[in-house]
Amino acid sequence: MKQSKKLGQCFLKDKNFVKKAIKSADITENDIVLEVGLGEGALTKELAKLAKFVYVIELDMRLEPFANQIMSEFKNVKVIWNDALKVDLKELGFNKIVANLPYQISSPITFKFLENDFDVAVLMYQYEFAKRMIGKPDTDEYSRLSVSIQYNSDVEFICKVPPTAFSPKPDVNSAIVKLTKREPLFHIENEEFFRNVLNAIFQHRNRTVKRALIDSSHEMNIERERLKEILENIKLDFDFSERVFKLAPEKIGELSNILYLNIISKK
């Protein structure tokens, strides 16, 4: 079967990396696992041998022969034919995620995962995307993604994966990353507002916090001039002259809380 470029299909063929991903997830007979992207089922079969149940979300119906073969062999596998971004993941009740993700949905599907409860996720990404996930302040890789993930997950870079591990060979290197959910490192007054602040400031990561906030005031649903007034009133509460890319995640949390208490709660 010819893989779809539109769907970003690169099937993982190298069994060494399949085994490495599964070992990193520490799958047991009590685990309910979510996989996004069936491929030809190399990963699915290995998961099914170990897990209590495996849900696979796949959009490409051309892969149905592979799905039927796997489900006839393993009764603990269910394939959901849908767009993973449209599926209500909360209904599935999984506790682990193991997937070779379609790279064009890496960002939205990762943010969707983070909105759900899980213990561990072992995921394949483009190498450059993976570096952003583990990005630290004052580095080129530090981003909204870095802060969003590190807020309530430990991130571990497992290994780099060469193009030769896939069919067809992608043009870039890939990487396996492990996310372990945990309690947040710092208190957030309102998580939706926190995400809005992240969206606002990282649109202008090289600017000062003040300039970034003003230029993206719409992300926080506040008029630009009103925000200027508020920032003037709270200028002693935070160093708004700092550059966005230098702010540690906990400082961004502090910024979010100050803004929330002075914007939303006083409306």
UniProtKB/Swiss-Prot annotation:
Location within or outside the cell: Cytoplasm
EC number: 2.1.1.-
SMART domains cross-referenced by the UniProt entry: rADc
Pfam families: RrnaAD (PF00398)
UniProt keyword list: Cytoplasm, Methyltransferase, RNA-binding, rRNA processing, S-adenosyl-L-methionine, Transferase
GO cellular component terms given for this protein: cytoplasm
Protein name: Probable ribosomal RNA small subunit methyltransferase A
Species this chain originates from: Methanococcus vannielii (strain ATCC 35089 / DSM 1224 / JCM 13029 / OCM 148 / SB)
